[in-house]
UniProtKB/Swiss-Prot annotation:
Family: Belongs to the RecR family.
Chain's gene name: recR
Domain Toprim: 81-176
One Pfam entry name: RecR_HhH
Name of the featured protein: Recombination protein RecR
Record-linked HAMAP family: RecR
Gene3D superfamilies in the cross-refs: 3.30.60.80, 3.40.1360.10, 6.10.250.240, RecR Domain 1
UniProt superkingdom: Bacteria
Lineage, opening ranks: Bacteria, Pseudomonadati, Pseudomonadota, Alphaproteobacteria, Magnetococcales
Matching CDD domains: TOPRIM_recR (cd01025)
Biological processes per GO annotation: DNA recombination; DNA repair
UniProt-recorded Gene Ontology molecular function terms: DNA binding; zinc ion binding
C4-type ZnF: 58-73
Organism: Magnetococcus marinus (strain ATCC BAA-1437 / JCM 17883 / MC-1)
C-alpha cells in the first residue's frame, strides 16, 4: 500500500535495494530516520556521499582504498612474497580479523559463474596473472569461498598460475562447504589458513 508520499516511497525503495533488506525493514529504517529528525538523515547522507566520493579500488590488488593503493599494499612490513586471492573486499576484512596472515591480497571482484554470465573476463584474473609474472611472489594462496563457484574459480586460478614457478595452496577445510569467508569466526579462519594445502 502506498503512503501517497513520493519522497517517502522513493526512500523506502532505495533502502530495500540493499542486500538482506526487504520492504518492511526498509520502511522501519526510513521511519527511524524521520523519527530521529533531520540530523540522523543528514549524517547518513553525508556518509554515503563520502563513501561514493572517497572509496575506490586499489590500483594493485582491487581491495577498497582511499588513495591509489590500499593500506595493505602500502605496508612495507607485510610479506610481499605471499598473495592471497579472495573473491570480495569483505573477505580481506575477514582474513585480517583472523590475524594469521601478513602477506598481500588480490581481490577478484567475484567468482566464476557461467550460469550468471560471469566468466574470466569479468574478474580481475588478468591483473592477478600480471602480478604473478612480475616476479617476487613465492606463494599464491587461493582463498575463494568453499562453494561450487568458488571451487571452480580456484581450479581456474590453479590452471592459470601452474606454468609459473610459485607454490600454489588452498585454504584448508575446516571451512564448511557452501560457507562464505565473511561469516566465519576468526578461529575457524585462522585454522583454515594455518592448514592450507598445496594444490599441485
Amino acid at each position: 500500500m502506498s503512503s501517497g508520499l513520493p519522497t517517502l516511497e522513493r526512500s523506502i525503495e532505495l533502502f530495500s535495494r540493499l542486500p538482506g533488506v526487504g520492504r518492511k525493514s526498509a520502511q522501519r529504517m526510513v521511519y527511524h530516520l524521520l523519527k530521529e529528525g533531520g540530523r540522523e538523515a543528514t549524517l547518513l547522507g553525508q556518509g554515503l556521499l563520502a563513501l561514493s566520493e572517497r572509496i575506490h579500488f586499489c590500483e594493485v590488488c582491487h581491495n577498497l582504498a582511499e588513495e591509489g593503493l590500499c593500506a595493505i599494499c602500502q605496508d612495507s612490513k607485510r610479506d610481499h612474497g605471499l598473495i592471497c586471492v579472495v573473491e570480495e573486499p569483505v573477505d580481506v576484512l575477514a582474513m585480517e580479523r583472523a590475524g594469521a596472515y601478513r602477506g598481500l591480497y588480490h581481490v577478484l571482484g567475484g567468482r566464476l559463474s557461467p550460469m550468471d554470465g560471469i566468466g574470466p573476463d569479468a574478474l580481475y584474473l588478468d591483473a592477478l596473472l600480471e602480478r604473478l609474472q612480475q616476479g617476487g611472489v613465492r606463494e599464491l594462496i587461493i582463498a575463494t569461498n568453499p562453494t561450487v563457484a568458488g571451487e571452480a574459480t580456484a581450479h581456474y586460478i590453479t590452471q592459470l598460475a601452474q606454468p609459473l614457478t610459485i607454490d600454489i595452496s588452498r585454504l584448508a577445510y575446516g571451512m564448511p562447504m557452501g560457507g562464505e569467508l565473511e561469516y566465519l569466526d576468526e578461529s575457524t579462519l585462522f585454522q583454515a589458513l594455518q592448514g592450507r594445502r598445496g594444490v599441485l
